[in-house]
Every structure is written in C-alpha cells, then in structure tokens.
A protein has these predicted regions:
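Extended active-site and interfacial segments that coordinate phosphate-rich ligands
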Residues: 12-38
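Extended, well-ordered protein cores
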Residues: 1-14, 24, 142, 150-151
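Extended, charge-enriched "interface" segments that sit outside catalytic cores
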Residues: 41-168
C-alpha cells in the first residue's frame, strides 16, 4: 500500500503518493536504461530495414544509433526525477518518458527489422524480453491503488451536489 493507503493513515498525503509514483518511475527508467545499454552493445549488425535507415542515415551500426535516443531518454528521465526528489528541482514533464508506447514503438521497429533480415533468434531473445517487461510494467513498474477514507468521498459529493443543486432546494 506504499503511497496509496489514505483510509486510515494520516501520513499518506497527495505529495507522498506523488513521490511514490515518481520513485517507481525513477526505478523503471534505471532498469530500462540498463537493459537498453546491453542491447545496444550486442546489436552490432549492419543490415537493417529502411525504416531504421530513414532515422539513422548511412551507418555501420544502425541498431545502436536507432536505440540510443530511447536509452538517453531513460537516462534523462532517471536523472530528472532524482534531481526533483533529492534537490527539489522543478520537474519538466515534457522531457520525461510519458508512456509505455514510447518504449514499445522503437523496440517494435527494431524487432521487425531483425526478423526481416534473418535475425529471428536475436529478435526473440533479450529484445523480446524487454518488450514484454515494458508491456507488463509500463513506465512506473507497478500500479498504485489509492484507498481513501469514505467520509472524504461523501464530503466531495456533498460539495458537488450543493453547488449544482442549491437553487433547486428553495423551490
């Protein structure tokens, strides 16, 4: 219940919940960066799809060049969250990894290219494992269930009803 148990623990505030979510994203970015670095080191093949060549241009290491921006985004996300949590620097959400699709889309392109260029074994190895983890865990590693003490919900509903239907009470 870390960060989500608001139905009996007065210490769990919205800022605590936000911090827990950021810590989870921080850890995810660190783990994904590590995995991407391993892939980049192992993908020395030159033969690739036109889709990758359009992005990388003529290079002897197209897969490495193609995957580096994703790895760098993981690193940037990890560092930005750490700077925010430790040094209280502002967090620019536009620079952070924001969806699992940001991870999966380039990995799908790499996998398709590897398969089309007779590298099915490589496409079905660590790359596929990383894709499965990204699909399963997304950018935060875990879902956070937030439990709120029920009188808070009652109060919120009362405020909505009071504002919207106050004029009907006098009829």
């Amino acid at each position: 219940w870390m960060g989500g148990d608001r139905d009996g623990n007065p210490n769990v505030t919205s800022s605590i919940t936000k911090e827990v979510i950021l810590l989870s994203r921080w850890e995810a970015a660190k783990l994904y960066e590590k995995e991407l670095t391993k892939l980049i080191r192992s993908f020395s093949m030159e033969k690739c799809s036109n889709k990758i060549l359009k992005v990388t241009g003529k290079t002897f290491e197209p897969y490495r060049v193609f995957l580096r921006p994703l790895r760098d985004k993981m690193r940037l996300t990890h560092r930005a969250i750490e700077n925010h949590l430790v040094r209280h620097k502002p967090l620019d959400q536009n620079k952070l990894l924001s969806s699992r699709e940001e991870i999966l889309k380039p990995l799908r392109v790499v996998r398709d290219s590897l398969e089309k260029n007779q590298n099915e074994n490589i496409a079905s190895g660590e790359l596929l494992d990383l894709m499965r983890r990204a699909k399963c865990f997304g950018i935060n590693l875990a879902r956070l269930d937030i439990r709120q003490e029920s009188s808070r919900h009652s109060q919120l509903l009362y405020e909505f009803i009071k504002k919207k239907y106050l004029s009907l009470i006098h009829i």
